[in-house]
Amino acid sequence: DLIIKLANKLQRQLLAKQNRSWEFDLEEGLLDSSKLPRVIIDPYNSLSFKKEKDLEFKDTVVTLLIDNSGSMRGRPITIAAICADILSRTLERCSVKVEILGFTTKNWKGGKSREKWNLENKPINPGRLNDLRHIIYKSADKPWRQSKKNLGLMLKEGLLKENIDGEALLWAFKRISIRKEERKILMIISDGAPVDDSTLSVNSGDYLEKHLKQTVNWIEENSKIEIL
């Protein structure tokens, strides 16, 4: 029920937020209160009515970016996969294209990034020290029917590791930016702050969280993409 409500809520949000347009000076419809003073001044003036125009639904694409970290193991990742499945089906019915992406790391303890840092005599402030894993479960142009089996891969044992959200968001942003749709929405499904022990052990404790906030702010200030 919760997932269906979420799908319906997103669907309503997509249909809302569109600029409303009205036809005025009609003989029937909603009473146009802005024209009442002229009727009061001269009772021979007829009442004026207005009607909302039917707007064509904006060409829209939605990206779902799903946290595939270890903290999502069990019920959370199952719910996320079901949620992505239902949203994809629901929005496809509204002619909205949906891309489903996932993000995690290849390793628990840094992998090749950490090995390289060790070989270079551990320079200070090294930045990210883990290898990223970005997954395309469903591209925007692929129908849900052809991609639905891919969502089960989220439940694969051993996939869920660390979460480096800022770079994942940038990756998703770059993918949606090149789309031709008029309206672009990026929805992040995550259970908390970014965490990667290998990176945070040699950088400031808020290093990844700060980068995520900077990324969100940059996207909001420099693009028309809506982040949910």
Residue ranges and their predicted role:
Residues 1-228:
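Acidic, glycine-rich A-domain
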